[in-house]
Amino acid sequence: MESDKMEIYESLIRWLGVLQLSAPHENIQQLSDGVALAQALNLIAPEMFSEGWLAKIKVDVGHNWRLKVSNLKKIIEGVYVYYQDILSLNLSEKLRPDAMKIAEKCDGYELGRLLQLILGCAVNCLEKQKYITQIMELEESLQRNIMAALQDIEYVWQGVSPSRNSINATSLDVKTLQEDRDSLAQKCHETNKKMLILIEEKSVLQQEITKLQALIARYENPNLIGDDGTSLGPVQLGSTRYNDLRKVVDSLKDELLQAETARDDLKMKSAMQEKEIADLQVKIDELHTATAEIAQLKDEIDILKEANDKLKMCETQLLTYKKKLEDYNDLKKQIKMLEECSAEYLKQNLQHEEEAKKYSGLKGQVELYKKEIQDLHAKLDSEMSKTVKTEFEYNQLQAKLSAVQREKENLLSERDVLRETCDELKCGQAAEDSESGNTMSKELHSSDVRDRIERLERENKVLREGQGGQTALSQLLDDANQRNEKLRDQLKAANQRVLLLSQHHNEDISSKSDMDIQLKQALELNEQRSSQIDEAQSQMTQLHTKIANLEAALAAKDQELLAADSRYKKCVEKAKEVIKTLDPRAINEALLLEKPSQDGEASSSSATGSGGDASTLTSTGSGRVPMGVQEEQLIATAFYRLGMTCQREAVDSRLALLSGPGQSFLSRQRQPAPRKPMNMPFAKK
C-alpha cells in the first residue's frame, strides 16, 4: 500500500510539471520550501490565492527549515479555507499534512497528501475543464494514479446522510392516505357501475311505460280498428269489449302499481346511492385536500431539506467563523500580553541601560582600584623583600650577639676567677711583707707560682686591653639592639600595613568579583531580553499578517452577506409580484404585511444602533436583517398556491390524456369519475 501511495505521489509531482511553474519542482527537496506549491495554487485559483497572498511566501529560503515551515503552514491553511469557503467541504484535522515533517525530513508521504489536496482544488476550481483535459492528455499510468488520488479525495468528501425520522413519518402518513384514497376510489367506481345499471333499468322501465301508455291511448280511442279490420266502435257498459278493456285496464293498473312501487324502490335506492355518492364525493374532496396537503408537505419537506442543508452549511461556516473569532480574540489577548511584555522589557532595558551607564562609571573606578592594587602589590613585594633581608640580617646579628654573649660570659667567669686569685695574691703579698722581706717571699714561692703569677699578670693586661674592646662591643651590641628594636617596630608597622592592604585588597577583589558577576548577569539578562524582544517582534509581525488575512476574509464575507441581502430583497419582491398576479385580493394583505416588516426593520435598526460595540461586532459578523414572520408566511402561501395550480394543471392534463379515444371500455370504466357534482335527471320528479 505504501509503495502504491508513493507511486501516486510521484505521479502528482510529475503532474505539477504540466502547470509550467517558474519555481523548481522536480523532486521532494525542491518542493519542500512551498514556493512551487504556492505558485500552483495562485495559477489554479487566483481569486482565492492572490498575488498579495503569494507575496507573503518567502522565496529565498535555502536550508532554513523555520521559513519552510511557515510557508507550508500558510499553504495548508489557505487550502483548508478554500475547501470550506469556496467548495463548502469540511476536511477533518486528520487529513492535515504535517508541515514540520515536510520541512525538516522532506517526508514524501506528507507532501503527497498536500499535493492530493491541491489536485482537489484544481479539479473543483472555475477552470477545472482545462486541468481535466491536461490530465487526460498525460500517460495512462499517470492518469490511473491521478484518478486513484481523486477517488481517495472523493471518498473523504462523502458524508453520512442525516437521520430523517420526521420525513419517514410523513412518508408513512402519505402512504396510508394514498391507500385510503385508492380504496375510496374503488368504492366510487363500484357505485358508479351500480348507478349505470340502475339508469339502464330506469330507461327500460320508462320504455315499457311509454308502450303501455300508447296501448291505453289506442284502446281509449273509439275510432280504433280491430285486428280483423272492423271498427270496434264506442265502448259501452256490459259489452265484451268493455269487459276486455276493463280487464286490460285492471291489469295495466296492477302493472302500473308494480312499476310505481319499483320506481319508488329505485328512487329510494338512487337517493341512498346519491347520499353515498355525496359522502364519497366529500371523502374524495377531503382526499384531494389531503393529497394537496401532502404535496404541500412534500414541498415543505424539500424546502426543509434545502433549509437543513443550508443550515448545516451555515452552522459549519458559523463554527469556522467562531473559531476564527476565538483565534482573533486569542491573538488580540496575545498582542496585548506581548505589548505589555514589550513595555516591561523596554522599561527593563532602560533600567539596564542606566545600570550599564552606572557600571561604566564604576568600571573606571574598578580600573583605578586595579592600578592601585597593582601598585600596592609592587610595594608589598618590595616591603616583603626588605623584610626578608632584615630578617636575614636580624638572624645574623642574633647569631653574632649570642656568640658575643657567650664570650662575655666566659670572660666574666675568668675575670671573677682572676679577681679571686688577685685577692689571694694580694693577701699573700701583704702577709709576706709583714713577716719577711722580698727575698723571703721569693724564696718561699716556687717557680710554678711565679710562672703562674706572671701568666696571670699578662692575662690581666690582656684582659684590661680586652675590656676596652668589650666596651666597644657592648656599644655595638647596644646599637644593634636599638636597630633591631627599630626594625621590629618597622616590621610590625609593615605587617600591620600589609594586613590592612591585604584586607583592602580582598575587599576590593570581592567587590570587583561581585561587580563582575552583576555585570555578567545584567549582560546575560540584556541579551535574553533582546532575544525575547526580537521573538516578540517576529510574533507581532506574524500576528499582524494573520490579522490582515482575517480582516480581508471578514471583508469578503461582508460582501457576500451584502450580496445575499440584495438577493433576498429581490426574491421578496418577486414573491410579492407573484402573489399579486395570483390573487389580486392579497395586495391589501401584502401592503399590511409591509408596514409591520418596515416597523420591525426600523426597530431592529434602532436596537442595533443603540447596542454599542458588541452590536456593531455582531452586525459586522452577520450583516443580515432578520426575516419577518409575516413575510415568511406570505412567501409560503404564494409558493403553496403556485404549487396547487401547477398540480391541478398536471392532473387535468393527465386526465385529458387518459380520456383519449384510443382506450378500451374497461380502461375507461376503471377511470375515476369527474370531480363535478352529478345532476340526476330523475330527481326532478
Swiss-Prot record:
InterPro entries: CH_dom, CH_dom_sf, Hook_C, HOOK_N, Troponin_sf. Involved in endocytic trafficking. Probably acts as a cytoskeletal linker protein that tethers endosome vesicles to the cytoskeleton. The keyword Ribonucleoprotein does not apply. Gene3D superfamilies: 1.20.5.340, Calponin-like domain. The keyword DNA damage does not apply. Residues 661-670 have a biased composition (Polar residues). Its main location: cytoplasm. This is Protein hook. It comes from Aedes aegypti (Yellowfever mosquito). Homodimer. Interacts with microtubules via its N-terminus.
